[in-house]
């Protein structure tokens, strides 16, 4: 014998806009559960299929296409084509039919939200306990852990794939020798590395300074270097 919607668990009131239809399930609402967000209020396209079905079931005027039957969350699509048409209208999908709608309903089987009533055509049953668990928001510590993991991943990605600001790859292979010479002089190497340091010109100058620490020991350029050196040494004997 078909039972009225009022005999269904009062848990349904969690998932329905307030007020709905003729006010079914209004009394006895669990205060720890809130109503649907404004985005899924009655008439909105931002609504899931299970919410849409509960919305239809809450209004006795829809008994011609869907109605509670048998208790314990069981309901029947008395006119499955009409239910599919209304669902397609709500979601702006004019090609919606019962075959597509039934495939969408099967998605809820693995989620423990709904099941098919065996031996009855177009009959389904809501699992309100599973539905309540599926709708529970994750705990606060889960949000914090997810944020920390995202920050760590972003930091690791930056360390592996990004060069520090102001550094550039080596312009030519010979500069690596200058980097080694500069390192022996206590100058941080530059170029293709993660160590901040002077540019290539400064590095070359530092390497030259390491080889010739005193300006007086710098060799003059060109072939006159030997003559200049001889005259410089000869000055000490006068």
From Swiss-Prot:
Subcellular location: Nucleus
DNA-binding region residue numbers: 47-127
GO biological process: cell differentiation; maternal behavior; neuron fate specification; neuron maturation; positive regulation of gene expression; regulation of transcription by RNA polymerase II
Annotated site, Breakpoint for insertion to form EWS-FEV fusion protein, chain positions: 18-19
Highest taxon above the source species: Eukaryota
Region (May mediate active transcriptional repression), start-end ranges: 129-238
GO cellular component: chromatin; nuclear speck; nucleus
Record's keyword terms, sorted: Chromosomal rearrangement, Developmental protein, Differentiation, DNA-binding, Neurogenesis, Nucleus, Transcription, Transcription regulation
Expressed in which tissues: In brain, exclusively expressed in the major serotonergic neurons of the dorsal and median raphe nuclei located in the midbrain and pons. Also detected in prostate and small intestine.
Any one GO MF annotation of this record: DNA-binding transcription factor activity, RNA polymerase II-specific
Record family assignment: Belongs to the ETS family.
Disease link: Sudden infant death syndrome: SIDS is the sudden death of an infant younger than 1 year that remains unexplained after a thorough case investigation, including performance of a complete autopsy, examination of the death scene, and review of clinical history. Pathophysiologic mechanisms for SIDS may include respiratory dysfunction, cardiac dysrhythmias, cardiorespiratory instability, and inborn errors of metabolism, but definitive pathogenic mechanisms precipitating an infant sudden death remain elusive. A chromosomal aberration involving FEV is found in Ewing tumors. Translocation t(2;21;22)(q23;q22;q12) that forms a EWSR1-FEV fusion protein with a potential oncogenic activity.
Function: Functions as a transcriptional regulator. According to PubMed:12761502, it functions as a transcriptional repressor. Functions in the differentiation and the maintenance of the central serotonergic neurons. May play a role in cell growth.
Name the UniProt record assigns to this protein: Protein FEV
Organism: Homo sapiens (Human)
